[in-house]
């Protein structure tokens, strides 16, 4: 994501402002940095921490689902719902976009006490960060396929992660 932001800033110096993204010195998010004092063509630009306010225009959409893994991958929504209509959909910066994420969240939390769908919409409409924890662990398995059969027809896709040889 940092690379995407840095590239965008080199094209449009107002990118951060337009997208409600703020720069901080470190992960504690205490000291805000003015973007006009950063040389976006240097390695220094990669050292800062970026934060976008929650809400429907956030690049991760309205929800992010963290799960333990060594690659820092997470599941997330998107404000660009039309991307789900595309045949080739590897637009994310390495994480997994989830279509109808509210349905997934409701399913994940369905066994939790005092949980209901109206509570989810109340949380999402609030545009603030809210951490929810599952009562029990649910395994997540992610497969990477470049060939499969669909309706009797073999399908091939580009090996964007260069994993077919491994």
Roles of regions detected by a PLM:
Residues 1-166:
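Well-ordered beta-sheet/strand-loop patches within structured domains
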């Amino acid at each position: 994501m940092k690379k995407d932001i840095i590239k965008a800033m080199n094209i449009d110096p107002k990118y951060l402002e337009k997208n409600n993204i703020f720069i901080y010195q470190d992960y504690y998010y205490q000291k805000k940095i003015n973007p006009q004092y950063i040389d976006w063509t240097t390695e220094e630009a990669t050292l800062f921490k970026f934060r976008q306010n929650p809400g429907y225009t956030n690049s991760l959409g309205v929800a992010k689902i963290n799960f333990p893994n060594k690659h820092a991958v997470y599941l997330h929504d998107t404000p660009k719902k039309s991307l789900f209509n595309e045949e080739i959909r590897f637009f994310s910066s390495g994480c997994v976009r989830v279509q109808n994420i509210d349905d997934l969240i409701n399913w994940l939390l369905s066994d939790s006490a005092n949980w209901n769908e109206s509570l989810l919409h109340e949380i999402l409409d609030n545009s603030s960060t809210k951490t929810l924890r599952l009562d029990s662990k649910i395994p997540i398995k992610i497969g990477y396929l470049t060939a499969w059969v669909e309706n009797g027809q073999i399908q091939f896709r580009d090996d964007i992660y260069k994993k077919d040889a491994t």
